[in-house]
Design a protein with these regions (language model features):
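Intrinsically disordered, low-complexity, compositionally biased regions/tails
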Residues: 22, 38, 98-100, 131
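Long, highly charged low-complexity segments enriched in Glu/Asp and Lys/Arg with interspersed Ser/Thr
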Residues: 125-132
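Long, contiguous N-terminal structural blocks used for assembly/anchoring
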Residues: 1-70
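Amphipathic protein-protein interaction modules
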Residues: 54-125
């Protein structure tokens, strides 16, 4: 049983890493000079890290069977890819679960991601990433 738990935690870690990477590189903010800045150039606050880990754990646990199906259904599709798609799909970017050729699995994951609601990173006054 401990081995299964270790595997599942490793899958969650991969999912979370993919989510954070996609959430940050796909997001921008406006600096004090009115210039657009890429979020991924900044360090994450504790709040951002906690928010991302909690959101990923909740989605991962609630949709684990479909995430497993997705990784088995499409060759080369990993938990990291699935985390990436969670970030893009929940924020309704132009790519995500729905365009992976995952059929019903993709539709269920898309609906679940949309139900999770959008979340947007921003840069705080301390130049750290926060999530609202």
């Amino acid at each position: 049983m401990a081995v299964q738990t270790d595997i599942r935690e490793a899958q969650l870690a991969q999912f979370t890493a993919g989510y954070i990477e996609a959430l940050y590189w796909s997001s921008t903010d406006i600096d004090e000079d009115g210039e657009t800045v890429n979020i991924d150039q900044f360090e994450a606050s504790t709040q951002a890290g906690d928010h991302c880990r909690a959101a990923c754990r909740e989605f991962f646990e609630a949709n684990y069977a479909d995430l497993i199906a997705a990784t088995e259904q499409q060759r080369g599709y990993s938990f990291e890819h699935a985390g990436h798609d969670f970030a893009l799909t929940r924020n309704r970017h132009g790519a995500g679960y729905w365009d992976r050729g995952l059929d019903d699995t993709g539709r269920r994951l898309t609906e679940a991601a949309h139900n999770a609601g959008e979340c947007w990173p921003y840069i705080g006054d301390d130049d750290l990433i926060y999530i609202h």
